[in-house]
Regions:
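Internal, well-ordered alpha-helical segments in soluble enzyme and binding-protein domains
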Residues: 97, 145-148, 228
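N-terminal low-complexity or simple alpha-helical regulatory segments
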Residues: 1-124
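Short hinge/gating elements
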Residues: 82-87, 131-135, 215-219
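Extended mid-to-C-terminal alpha-helical interaction segments
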Residues: 172-332
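DNA-contacting interfaces and partner/effector-binding or oligomerization modules
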Residues: 113-202
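Short, contiguous, pocket-lining structural segments
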Residues: 6, 20, 137, 141, ...
Length: 332
């Protein structure tokens, strides 16, 4: 059986809460066989079971109310793994970002599954950690799961958005004090998974990061990696239904060598194929949701000469066929 693991980064806020009130943090960590030097190992992994036991022991022994919530309050987007941040940053829409989250969530917790469920005019972003079905006090972990998902959504909505509903797999009721921080959010527990919901209309939200690229640390002259990424993302949709430029042609347009072009993309955390896939699937999902275009026409419009190849690639990326996607996501 696989041991469920989580990044040390997610236990650091719990330790910081203990430190702030003068608790014997190091002794508690050692008791549960966790590394005392967590801040030196944010990208390392530890067993979720031990992390949850540590959090519960700290809460109980120190009289802390809702330590999971207190830890989640400290969680920001930049605490996610570098690779997941890059993937989200360069997703053109929230929907693509959430699909990528479903694919790459195990970067944060090794046995977590994330998926989307349509529920009337809302979409639930669900998460569940395999191998933890009978584990007590999972609410501490599930607070982090729900809030880091919320932080991803906020990259598209702005920093003040909160979900209308937050659900916990654990049998757990937030305290009145905790609820006072979430006056516009309904809490439910004992669910099949943990989840937050977003309006279906949010799925088309564009990524503001595309318009305001982060500062680059590239050496040398010429456009930075982030400038290159922004330009390519703007340009590719124009070519999808014609001849898509090769990587050599894109490099020539940018006035740099292929090697420099690839190095700049790498510094931004993406590859040319990542950008091309993103443009293709953004175009395809928009057509499938918003029009009645035939699947074959969606394939051609998205840069595929073979509709069967399009269907296979779409299913590999999204986990459903284009036809199934349309039936599930197109507004009724």
């Amino acid at each position: 059986m696989t041991i469920p693991l989580t990044r040390c980064q997610f236990i650091i806020p719990f330790a910081a809460i203990c430190d702030a009130i003068g608790a014997p943090t190091e002794a508690l960590l050692t008791k549960f066989r966790l590394p005392a030097s967590l801040e030196e190992k944010p990208e390392h992994y530890i067993p979720i079971l031990l992390a949850v036991r540590f959090a519960e022991a700290a809460q109980r022994s120190q009289g802390i109310t809702d330590i999971g919530f207190q830890a989640a309050r400290q969680l920001q987007f930049f605490h996610l793994s570098e690779k997941l941040r890059a993937i989200i940053r360069f997703s053109p829409t929230l929907f693509i970002a959430l699909q990528q989250l479903c694919k790459w969530a195990s970067l944060e917790d090794t046995t977590v599954s994330v998926w989307l469920e349509r529920n009337d005019h809302h979409v639930r972003i669900c998460s569940k950690v395999a191998g933890t079905a009978r584990m007590p006090h999972l609410e501490h972990s599930q607070w982090l799961q729900n809030v880091y998902t919320m932080q991803i959504v906020r990259q598209f909505t702005g920093p003040h958005w909160v979900p209308a509903t937050m659900a916990f797999e654990a049998r757990y009721e937030p305290s009145l004090e905790t609820r006072s921080f979430w006056q516009n959010t309904r809490f439910i527990s004992d669910q099949n998974s943990s989840w937050i919901d977003i309006p279906v209309s949010f799925l088309d939200l564009p990524n503001p990061a595309s318009e305001t690229p982060a500062p680059s640390h590239d050496d040398g002259v010429g456009p930075s990696g982030h400038e290159i990424v922004s330009a390519v993302k703007l340009m590719l949709p124009s070519y999808l239904d014609e001849r898509i430029p090769t990587i050599a042609e894109i490099a020539e347009m940018a006035g740099i060598s292929i090697r420099s072009f690839q190095r700049k993309l790498s510094s931004a955390g993406v590859s040319y194929s990542d950008l091309l896939d993103g443009a293709r699937f953004e175009n395809a999902t928009k057509l499938l949701r918003d029009t009645d275009a035939k699947i074959i026409d969606v394939a051609f419009s998205s840069g595929y000469s073979d509709p069967a190849h399009f269907t296979r690639a779409f299913r590999r990326f999204f986990g459903v066929t284009p036809r199934e996607f349309r039936g599930k996501w197109k507004p009724q």
